[in-house]
């Protein structure tokens, strides 16, 4: 090797080591492993007590997370669940789309329940896009036009807002805080575009501009460059927790398209929604409900349209936080979980709502998908037609038929409940670190 090559090689190594050492801490990520409603908020609330910053990276107020803290139940849609911890900062990242009226309504409702000092510990990205009322009207109209083939959206305007972002005529929070004349021009332009496409929507432009002039001053104290903020925090050794909204099977790329949401709710959305490089990611925690639920339409291989489904729905109080719709219920689905683990790279798992299975004499778990000819699939189907045609192979595990609700030590769980957890762990080759047996943060059992 020539002297210059050796020098260049050493220079590369020095630069590489410098880049890898520039961050003193790693980011932990909490992701839903199914179709949402797994209990991510409770897991984030538990972990937030030990972190400095909690972030939302994608989605909007179509997400719904419930946290029970000190006997009070908080419902969050845009605010990160970690906001109940007064010692940490909450960040709404650039990948989130924000309906400001809903955000401030959510703040008021939760302040009435005891949430305090939010103005000192909430930061909103100046690059986050805005959801306007007309986006919500368009969302509802598009769903109505589909009739019986609707996608079951929350009608919160999330899809139309991301569409505006993708077609490059959306408006960012930072633009609202800049020259208001420029904001007004952009707002009039985006309204004109939507009225042209959807003539029946009615927007009082001047009234909306007056309203958003007020919102500009209300939101201004919260807004900053969150990318710089987060990178500075990592270089200073601050601990960061990211709360994924929705779930892997609702991801726009990896979910059961088109019955999905409009953002990337898998690990990739964490990076693009916060401006973080891959080497900053440490733990990736997959949250898995002990059975499977889904809100709205779309394929659901293990759905139980019978007494089992009714029991899970009733015992689990499976009502959507955002939509108030009953969730569809079915057995745990290992092929689905293997697929989302493949995409997200879970380093550990938290199983929630194990206690809902307490009364069952036996519990089924999907372990394989089969084609109509009986051939086992070695991949997760890429189309809803293929997924709709599969047959499910189940393993049958014995139940435990005793209450687990007040148990706080894994070894004190009934043997069959422990076996259920170990079965999932073995099938996925991912360690189960926590098991939830109730609503409060104290009901999460540390397995190891």
Swiss-Prot record:
Q: Which UniProt keywords apply?
A: Cytoplasm, GTP-binding, Ligase, Magnesium, Metal-binding, Nucleotide-binding, Purine biosynthesis
Which pathway does the database say it acts in?
Purine metabolism; AMP biosynthesis via de novo pathway; AMP from IMP: step 1/2
Q: Which residues bind substrate?
A: 321-327
Among the Pfam families in the record, one is Adenylsucc_synt
Residues involved in Mg(2+) binding: 37, 64
Positions of GTP binding = 36-42, 64-66, 327, 353-355, 436-438
Q: How is the cofactor bound?
A: Binds 1 Mg(2+) ion per subunit.
Q: Which top EC class is given? A: ligase
Asked if the record carries the keyword Transmembrane, the reply is no
Which Gene Ontology molecular-function terms are recorded? adenylosuccinate synthase activity; GTP binding; magnesium ion binding
Q: What is its EC number?
A: 6.3.4.4
Matching entries from InterPro entries are given as: Adenylosuccin_syn_GTP-bd, Adenylosuccin_syn_Lys_AS, Adenylosuccinate_synth_dom1, Adenylosuccinate_synth_dom2, Adenylosuccinate_synth_dom3, Adenylosuccinate_synthetase, P-loop_NTPase
Cofactor dependence is on: Mg(2+)
Reaction equation(s) it catalyzes: IMP + L-aspartate + GTP = N(6)-(1,2-dicarboxyethyl)-AMP + GDP + phosphate + 2 H(+)
What Gene Ontology terms describe where this protein resides (cellular component)? cytoplasm
* Binding, IMP: 37-40, 62-65, 154, 168, 246, 261, 325
SMART domains linked to this entry: Adenylsucc_synt
Per the Swiss-Prot or TrEMBL record, the active site comprises 37, 65
Q: Where in the cell is it found?
A: Cytoplasm
Quaternary structure note: Homodimer.
Q: What does this protein do?
A: Plays an important role in the de novo pathway and in the salvage pathway of purine nucleotide biosynthesis. Catalyzes the first committed step in the biosynthesis of AMP from IMP.
UniProt protein name: Adenylosuccinate synthetase
Species of origin: Drosophila ananassae
């Amino acid at each position: 090797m020539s002297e210059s090559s050796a020098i260049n090689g050493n220079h590369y190594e020095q630069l590489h080591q410098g880049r890898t050492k520039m961050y003193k801490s790693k980011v932990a990520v909490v992701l839903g492993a199914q179709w949402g409603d797994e209990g991510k908020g409770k897991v984030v609330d538990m972990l937030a007590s030990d972190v400095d910053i909690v972030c939302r990276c994608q989605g909007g107020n179509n997400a719904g997370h419930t946290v029970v803290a000190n006997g009070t139940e908080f419902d969050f849609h845009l605010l990160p669940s970690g906001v109940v911890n007064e010692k940490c900062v909450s960040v709404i990242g650039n990948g989130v789309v924000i309906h400001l009226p809903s955000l401030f309504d959510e703040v008021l409702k939760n302040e009435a329940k005891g949430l305090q000092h939010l103005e000192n510990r909430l930061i909103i990205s100046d690059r986050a896009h805005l959801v306007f009322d007309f986006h919500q009207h368009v969302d509802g109209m598009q769903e109505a036009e589909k009739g019986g083939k609707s996608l079951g959206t929350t009608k919160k305007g999330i899809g139309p807002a991301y569409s505006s972002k993708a077609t490059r005529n959306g408006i960012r929070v930072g633009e609202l805080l800049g020259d208001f004349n420029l904001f007004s021009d952009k707002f009039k332009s985006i309204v004109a575009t939507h009225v042209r496409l959807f003539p029946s929507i009615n927007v009082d432009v001047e009234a909306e501009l007056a309203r958003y002039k007020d919102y500009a001053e209300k939101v201004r104290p919260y807004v900053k460059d969150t990318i710089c903020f987060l990178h500075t925090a990592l270089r200073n050794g601050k601990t960061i927790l990211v709360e994924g909204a929705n779930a892997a099977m609702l991801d726009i790329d990896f979910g059961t398209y088109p019955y999905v949401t409009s953002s990337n709710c898998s690990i990739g959305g964490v990076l693009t929604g916060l401006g973080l490089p891959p080497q900053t990611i440490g733990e990736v925690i997959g949250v898995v409900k002990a059975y499977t639920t889904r809100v709205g339409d779309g394929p659901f291989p293990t759905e139980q349209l019978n007494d089992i489904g009714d029991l899970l729905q009733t015992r689990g109080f499976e009502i959507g936080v955002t939509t108030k719709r009953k969730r569809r219920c079915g057995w745990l689905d290992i092929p689905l979980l293997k697929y989302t683990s493949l995409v997200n790279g879970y380093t550990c798992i938290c199983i929630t709502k194990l206690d809902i299975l307490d009364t069952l004499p036996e519990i089924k778990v999907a372990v394989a998908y089969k084609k109509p000819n009986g051939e086992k699939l070695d991949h997760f189907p890429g189309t809803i037609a293929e997924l709709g045609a599969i047959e499910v192979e189940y393993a049958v595990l014995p139940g435990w038929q005793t209450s687990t609700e007040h148990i706080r030590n894994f070894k004190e769980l009934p043997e069959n409940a422990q076996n259920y957890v170990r079965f999932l762990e073995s099938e996925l080759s991912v360690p189960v670190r926590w098991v939830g047996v109730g609503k409060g943060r104290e009901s999460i059992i540390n397995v190891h």
